[in-house]
Amino acid sequence: MSQQRTARRQPSLLVDPAQETVRRRCRDPINVENLLPSKIRINLEENVQYVSMRKALKVKRPRFDVSLVYLTRKFMDLVRSAPGGILDLNKVATKLGVRKRRVYDITNVLDGIELVEKKSKNHIRWIGSDLNNFGAAPQQKKLQAELSDLSAMEDALDELIKDCAQQLLELTDDKENERLAYVTYQDIHGIQAFHEQIVIAVKAPEETRLDVPAPREDSITVHIRSTKGPIDVYLCEVEQNHSNGKTNDGIGASPSKSSHPQCPEKEDEPPQ
């Protein structure tokens, strides 16, 4: 009998307690019927919860969350929002979730460079520059002001362009103005920019296409194409102001023998 007990295998230290309990109960023929699946499941679930709880206790905060740089940034945020720059160090330690010793590490450095002063044992006051304008150099402020002025000017120009476009649309769509949509030779002659220039007036229907290729040294080519009617082209010779009748290029300018187009009658279609 003693030999049978000695030959019995001792449970290993690495065996799960829940599994060993099940194994021992299974060896006893009397308790096999009383062993229910629910009991096995309960034991396993309790074991898993125990292991998960142990792992949760071992979780540590990230190193960056407790670093001095991170705490200093949070401390400066509290200084920026504090009335009068006065802080209670006990409340600071509570908000930062660290020991008061870590807060003293920050305040001692700031006190050494004369950015804070101690009001009492647990209170300090910020005496440095205004944190709301921290980092805003004068040049940056100047550029921001110029940018604001340019933005306002751009908005004003956009409104003017929009207003001019609306007025032009109303002018061209008005039936009363359609019969007066023409210019005379005297109108062209009165424009100073057209003096000593060759002016060509084109009267064409809607959707006429005009292409001007890159000009050459001695000539300019213009292509006009229309699919809705004929195209009328007028050469408007602007008179020269020189008494000798010569242009700036030294070429003689003879007066035009053709009659200049005058103001058309109402029934005629005016040139565009």
Swiss-Prot record:
Leucine-zipper: annotated segments: 143-164
Keyword set includes Transcription: yes
Source organism of the structure: Mus musculus
Recorded GO MF terms: DNA binding; DNA-binding transcription factor activity; DNA-binding transcription repressor activity, RNA polymerase II-specific; protein dimerization activity; RNA polymerase II cis-regulatory region sequence-specific DNA binding; sequence-specific DNA binding
Compartments reported by the entry: Nucleus
Protein name: Transcription factor E2F6
UniProt region (Dimerization), positions on chain: 130-222
Function: Inhibitor of E2F-dependent transcription. Binds DNA cooperatively with DP proteins through the E2 recognition site, 5'-TTTC[CG]CGC-3'. Has a preference for the 5'-TTTCCCGC-3' E2F recognition site. E2F6 lacks the transcriptional activation and pocket protein binding domains. Appears to regulate a subset of E2F-dependent genes whose products are required for entry into the cell cycle but not for normal cell cycle progression. Represses expression of some meiosis-specific genes, including SLC25A31/ANT4.
Motif (DEF box): 95-129
Location of the region described as Transcription repression in the Swiss-Prot/TrEMBL record: 173-272
